[in-house]
Amino acid sequence: MDLFEYQARDLFAKHDVPVLAGEVIDTPEAAREITERLGGKSVVKAQVKVGGRGKAGGVKLAASADEAVARATDILGMDIKGHTVHKVMIAETAPEIVEEYYVSFLLDRANRTFLSIASVEGGVEIEEVAATRPEAVAKTPIDAIDGVTPEKAREIVEAAKFPAEVADKVADILVKLWDTFIKEDALLVEVNPLAKVVSGDVIALDGKVSLDDNAEFRHPDFEALHDKAAANPLEAAAKEKNLNYVKLDGEVGIIGNGAGLVMSTLDVVAYAGEAHGNVKPANFLDIGGGASAQVMANGLEIILGDPDVRSVFVNVFGGITACDEVANGIVQALKLLEDRGEKVEKPLVVRLDGNNAELGRKILTDANHPLVQRVDTMDGAADKAAELAHAAAK
């Protein structure tokens, strides 16, 4: 889960990383009181999870409370690289900046360790610095057990050649950033720029944090960090039902058991779709191993609620998940929707194989629902689902 800048700033403050004061708002007029509290001037910063805000006009200085309101009015609702601005942060203006640095901690998946990246050339994309001046970027592996001690922080500072007058302050901030990284179960903690100001202080002016969704059970407060305004409503509904669902841009709804089978199903449907108007998969939905009839019903309800879906392909290989449970789930889901008075018009193609496949097929045959078609091979079912989706578009 990627955080907004204001959320990253709050986490930094929680772990005693020096930051500037600021508050997030979603209405322009609220900028007035905050700016007055900050001394009559502020920086209005768009809160979007994408870089390049400044170049896009999403970061503006305000020399008065009235100007802050005007800036907030301009920025709220702005589109920045496909992201709509729903909130802005009204932040304290930074003292005169003398130098800008870059520091981060991240999970190095390739080497199965943690990594520190630091540079005295901050304020720009670190990828640009690495490409043009690789010697200016210091990469230091971090032992998962030892972590970042004051001694390790000094090693990072020396490797990146930070000026002597800020070495101790940067080292102290590195220890606190590591504390943030570990205690918040982060995958990335980045400060860019980490600025030396005219007073000699070193302050985190902008930050990026990505948290590990798999660790959310350890952090009840993470729930409040989710961006509900930008969330796809189908993905949000699936999350509430503990379903592994990702919305895609096609027309064939996909349900399968096991991530590998679902990924294969996406490929087979995409291939079949080439012969049927280039229809594509509309989603990834894994109901998992041992899924009950209720889980199947929940998944089907999500997919049938997607207006882009024209047909549904249910592809199940019974192992822990018994095919009769899946079949019962399909029958239950259709009955549930119809009992609510909802119009179910999208055809379902069902392929069942493996554990209790014959019983599952019999349940579907006995139910005799006009929208459900049984196809007993994966390729044949994919072709039929693509054909039906294409026909529905005509």
Swiss-Prot record:
The keyword Iron does not apply. Substrate binds at N257, G319, I320, T321. Keywords: ATP-binding, Ligase, Magnesium, Metal-binding, Nucleotide-binding, Tricarboxylic acid cycle. PROSITE patterns: ATP_GRASP (PS50975), SUCCINYL_COA_LIG_3 (PS01217). Residues 9-237 form the ATP-grasp domain. Pathway: Carbohydrate metabolism; tricarboxylic acid cycle; succinate from succinyl-CoA (ligase route): step 1/1. Belongs to the succinate/malate CoA ligase beta subunit family. Heterotetramer of two alpha and two beta subunits. This is Succinate--CoA ligase [ADP-forming] subunit beta 1. It comes from Streptomyces coelicolor (strain ATCC BAA-471 / A3(2) / M145). The lineage of its organism: Bacteria, Bacillati, Actinomycetota, Actinomycetes, Kitasatosporales. The gene is sucC1.
